Amino acid sequence: MISNGDIKSIIRNSMKLDEKTRIDEALVAQTKTYDLKTEFLSGKNKQAHKELYEGYVENFNKISAELDTADRDNVNANHSQFRSLKIDETYNMNALYLHELYFANISDLQSNITMDSLAYMRLSRDFGDFDKWQKDFMACCSASRCGWAVTYYNLFTQTYMNAVIDLHSIEVPIGCFPVIVMDVWQHAYYKDYLRDVNTYTTAMMKELNWTVVEDRIRKAEKIAQVIR
């Protein structure tokens, strides 16, 4: 595991900053490794997607460091370095975490969900039945304009909902905890499925990691109890 100090040194070198330059605000995200055993995605696709994810992590760290010295006095809504960095910070932060959530909840070769499982019961409760949740989620996958489909736990209503996210930061619902994440940017599937997003998402749904999903559900509902 690389230490925060080592990563800050990497950031300094990439930005050509000397040792005296403070990068206190650098949040120092670290890349994670995912063993995607699925055969529904080719090796080239997996490698390209991995490199894209690593790029978001690197950019997030750079932006976070640049914010340390950004001018906060001459800021306006039309054009300013601070505004641009804050927008890019959210974009890259969402991108890296959405990718981590996605990689972690796909590629389970022993994927299985039972009617008495927590995930099955919760999704059936809030969507009428499990099949209705799945149909709605697949519709969200098709509706996204280069972005994501996400099943969230709404901490305010304490119910599960599906959402369409465009890019990484458009239409992101507030106060919601992601439990199922599907990447429907074309980079996620074009090398293997061309523009056939439906075949791609159907394949990914067959290998959802319900163990990971249920762990997220438990965490989400614990958070909701704390903030009630």
Identify the residue ranges that each predicted region occupies:
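Feature for soluble, non-membrane regions of globular proteins
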Residues: 3-6, 10, 14-228
